[in-house]
């Protein structure tokens, strides 16, 4: 009995020391597991089970816990102020899991603010705004150890990466139009993505948000997986199943700002707390949202802990950080007089820059095989450089310049494309300045921008040929890849977050064949290392011909580390080009190994069936050339053939 009592005393002493350290590190901006301290947690005190609640509200006069267990009466369960820095605490005996609760925060002006828990693990959704008590203990049995071991040995920079971006609420819906459960989505989405040859899924929305129309980007519950699609353990099932199929999960994450919903982080204790107090930094007026105070220690603990939380609890493989440019610049979408320069007289938000460096260093130290991806739309230097080299420390960045240039090009009538040929060639100039991902994301198929197939000029057949042409060109271009859902089968209308994709289109031959093309092209990409092994190195790409603008043709080589090569020819004209001469680096014969114009893809079936043999003669800087036929609106890939007929 004495031994048991001693063990209990030792445990309590260790518990108090851990809590004391957690408090200290939180206020220092260095507690990156704050979710284990703040929020609601199942525990046992004096042999009584219940939940302990902790919340940070330094400007509050008082705080209490209200919920369905006390009739939402803010006078029944007052919290105790544990620290001068404003952490409040209360143990509620006998409280069961999945109890609804909020914090009733009494502000200095006498208002009673009913706030959802910033650290809640599970929340109500949409019009309902309370938090649930929830414990992760014994909720799910992970079986993804093989994936984790595989990922440990993976060099992401020299591996294929082809991301399928998915909005969970509109990929598919139930027959009655309601949202599907995470498990139901997983059982359909994961095999589908695997069949189509994607390596990763990027999912939105994940964190809890009240408004469907925000697409999940205006978050009130940063630690709550949205309950639109089920419980936390249901989402764990989705991630686990993806890993069992060899597919990584990336989440869209929004540390830049938050909405002004009354139950959320907005002026949490009656005054600006999570947001800047300085009105020149406080708000994104065009979005109607508040900006996190990146220089405040407690906010750094909150946000960095949040990134760690998703990876620790849900085995997320990567984070795509949204709206990075809005964080980096003090004058982002601001007029003169609406912002103040930093201490050096510049427009950089030094606190946000420092925050991003700490974020990436922390995450990639704990999870070195994971991805930290920046959606950054400017030319800010060193986004994917390490912090010790004065970079931000992301390992990849969306190539928004490439995206804008090439989409502008393909939307042009082919007759006029010769005048914007530089849109295709200029991105190669900076292709290795950062570690890039080429994104055709949700932002490019809404708000009048049209779907991918409907961006293409011409008649019906030309639109589909244009998509095939563009996609294989994209797969062969340096950089990892991202494609938004629906593009793979030719969704004609723009994406609508309130409706599922037009899956009925697969009943039509052209759409089914386009889906077949996507699958075969993606699998071809996976199987050929010259298309990805040296994405981040200038050694992986070499122009053959970039100047044939009058005929809308490009030719280039892709190489791997062993020197194996593919020759890519892109014809962005609706005109067939017969006897087209192209310089090649070596003698021998060349074999056409992929052609977007095949009949099984919906094309005309024009092929180079005979193996073109290199002839002696100067062409494009080489001593030999081959003659090939280029179908209209097509991309072709050739490979050198050894003398014995074996491919290199």
Short names for language-model regions:
Residues 1-48, 52, 80-165, 170-177, ...:
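The feature marks proteins involved in alpha-glucan
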Residues 55, 103, 166, 193, ...:
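Conserved, mostly hydrophobic/aromatic
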Residues 56-63, 585-588:
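Short proline/glycine-enriched turn/loop motifs at strand-loop junctions of beta-rich domains
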Residues 97-101, 610-648:
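C-terminal beta-strand-rich structural cap/linker in extracellular carbohydrate-active enzymes
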Residues 124, 139, 145-161, 167-348:
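Substrate-binding/active-site clefts of carbohydrate-active enzymes
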Residues 126, 315-317, 335-500, 505, ...:
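Conserved alpha/beta catalytic core and glycan-binding cleft of carbohydrate-active enzymes
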Residues 510-531:
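Catalytic cores of secreted or luminal carbohydrate-active enzymes
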